[in-house]
């Protein structure tokens, strides 16, 4: 009899349950929010089966979900998670669920003649890439090469689309080791790239270029320790001719384009007429920076920079004064700002991805999280444009990692260069739908001279 009681007690313990209420922001997968009792031994897969049962989806039980309690992912059993979070099993626990993001299964490789150092997929369904082969290229969402532009005299380090309401004539800017910026026109109907202007004032390699949210200005950062602002209004559009007068701004006054001491017309390697601009709108030297590696915008009134002196700086655009400086533990190689959350994600030489809240008044608390998974130097970071939680990172370890900042473990890792010792240098998000986080795929480039588009499985199913 005593043995039977022990077995019964053991059985009761194994079947301990807790009352939970499931909630989601996705109406397509919503179930009843009436509290139900579930075994505390369940983990992510067991809870996924519960959701499928409530939705009466017997044929979709293999599709996993992710679950969060108070904003923290469940990565153990319910029992362990509840204890670690100091929650009570006597109360009803609210569990948020969402479709799990899985590793892309399809990939398109796009060959270059040298390292692919930079990519930008922010223009609807198009990717622009820059390479150490001196060229810039525009690719379609399907990985088809549309056009190539040449003119730089050294490797291209950074590229950025310039938003344009004209859907046929687009433009983008590139930055190079030849110390110049070039602005290009891309005519979609003619599948043709033409150079519009060459911006010359930096005295060192230009590491980063970015366009303001209102597409009125370009900011560039260089190893010469300067940040420069350029007015897009000063750059002739695709219809300009050699005889047109081009107005140029600077911080004190405006001069006409026929002043050949400041601007002249020149012919590049493709025999296209381009316009040399030799004075920026404004410039600032970042003292003791050891070189500025990256620039970005928060709004059209504020910029961000990262540098080799391990500091993030927030700049007032109107004065080019750094209103705030955030010290970091290691030199910065890249950063990105989230319009959704107001957070900054940074890449560092010490292999760590870090998340910062620039709104924090205490600089020791402004770092909200460290994401540690890469084995060596992190080269690029990007926020998913439609999510306050998701970002990607690339590294010299040959991987692309996709993160949800509510957990310290990557949602998935793409080993892009598993058969070689090549490095991943750059990344961006691309979409041809632009609706939500599931409509974005990742594009990356590296030292194997290939651009890769890692297609989001859910987006592919919607094509």
UniProtKB/Swiss-Prot annotation:
Q: Does the keyword Membrane apply?
A: no
According to UniProt, the name of this protein is: Ribosome biogenesis protein WDR12 homolog
What does the function comment of this entry state?
Answer: Required for maturation of ribosomal RNAs and formation of the large ribosomal subunit.
Region described as Ubiquitin-like (UBL) domain: spans on this chain: 16-99
Where does this chain mainly localize?
nucleus
Listed PANTHER family: RIBOSOME BIOGENESIS PROTEIN WDR12, WD40 REPEAT PROTEIN 12, 37
Alphabetized SUPFAM superfamilies for the sequence: WD40 repeat-like
Keywords, comma-separated and alphabetical: Nucleus, Repeat, Ribosome biogenesis, rRNA processing, WD repeat
Q: Which residues form the signal peptide?
A: none
Set out the biological process GO terms recorded for this chain's protein: maturation of 5.8S rRNA from tricistronic rRNA transcript (SSU-rRNA, 5.8S rRNA, LSU-rRNA); maturation of LSU-rRNA from tricistronic rRNA transcript (SSU-rRNA, 5.8S rRNA, LSU-rRNA); response to mercury ion; ribosomal large subunit biogenesis
Extract the ranges annotated as region (Disordered): 241-262
Tell me the organism.
Answer: Dictyostelium discoideum (Social amoeba)
Sequence similarity: Belongs to the WD repeat WDR12/YTM1 family.
Q: Where are the WD repeats?
A: 111-149, 151-194, 201-240, 287-325, 327-366, 373-413, 419-463
Cell location = Nucleus, Nucleolus; Nucleus, Nucleoplasm
Any one annotated GO CC term: nucleoplasm
Record InterPro entries: G-protein_beta_WD-40_rep, NLE, WD40/YVTN_repeat-like_dom_sf, WD40_repeat_CS, WD40_repeat_dom_sf, WD40_rpt, WDR12/Ytm1
Organismal lineage: Eukaryota, Amoebozoa, Evosea, Eumycetozoa, Dictyostelia
């Amino acid at each position: 009899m005593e043995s039977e009681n022990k077995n019964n007690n053991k059985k009761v313990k194994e079947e301990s349950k807790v009352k939970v209420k499931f909630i989601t922001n996705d109406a397509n997968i919503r179930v009843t929010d009436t509290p139900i009792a579930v075994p505390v031994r369940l983990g992510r897969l067991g809870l996924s089966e519960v959701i499928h049962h409530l939705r009466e989806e017997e044929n979709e039980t293999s599709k996993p979900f992710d679950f969060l309690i108070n904003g923290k992912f469940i990565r153990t059993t319910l029992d362990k998670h509840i204890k670690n979070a100091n929650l009570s099993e006597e109360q009803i626990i609210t569990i948020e669920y969402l479709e799990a993001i899985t590793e892309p299964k399809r990939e398109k490789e796009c060959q270059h003649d040298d390292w692919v150092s930079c990519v930008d997929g922010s223009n609807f369904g198009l990717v622009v890439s820059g390479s150490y082969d001196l060229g810039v290229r525009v690719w379609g969402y399907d990985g088809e090469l549309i056009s190539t532009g040449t003119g730089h005299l050294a490797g291209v380090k950074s590229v950025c689309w310039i938003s344009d309401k004209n859907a046929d004539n687009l433009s983008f800017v590139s930055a190079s080791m030849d110390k110049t910026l070039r602005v290009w026109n891309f005519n979609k109907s003619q599948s043709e790239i033409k150079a519009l202007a060459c911006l010359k004032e930096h005295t060192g390699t230009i590491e980063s270029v970015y366009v303001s949210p209102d597409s009125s200005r370009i900011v560039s950062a260089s190893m010469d320790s300067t940040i420069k602002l350029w007015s897009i209004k000063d750059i002739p559009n695709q219809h300009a001719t050699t005889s047109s007068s081009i107005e140029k701004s600077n911080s004190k006054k405006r001069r006409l384009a026929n002043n050949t001491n400041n601007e002249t017309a020149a012919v590049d390697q493709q025999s296209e007429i381009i316009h040399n601009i030799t004075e920026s709108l404004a410039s600032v030297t970042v003292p003791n920076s050891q070189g500025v590696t990256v620039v970005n915008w928060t709004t059209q009134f504020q910029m961000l920079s990262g540098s080799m002196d391990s500091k993030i700086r927030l700049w007032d655009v109107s004065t080019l004064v750094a209103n705030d400086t955030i010290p970091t533990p290691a030199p910065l190689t890249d950063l990105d700002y989230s319009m959704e959350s107001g957070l900054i994600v940074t890449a560092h030489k010490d292999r760590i991805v870090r998340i910062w809240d620039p709104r924090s008044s205490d600089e020791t608390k402004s770092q909200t999280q460290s994401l540690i998974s890469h084995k060596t130097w992190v080269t690029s970071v990007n926020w998913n444009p439609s999510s306050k939680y998701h970002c990607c990172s690339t590294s010299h370890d040959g991987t692309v990692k996709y993160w949800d900042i509510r957990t310290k473990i990557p949602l998935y890792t793409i080993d892009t260069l598993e058969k070689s010792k090549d490095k991943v240098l750059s990344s961006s998000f691309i979409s041809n739908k632009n609706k939500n986080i599931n409509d974005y795929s990742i594009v990356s480039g590296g030292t194997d001279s290939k651009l890769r588009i890692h297609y989001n499985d859910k987006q592919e199913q919607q094509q």
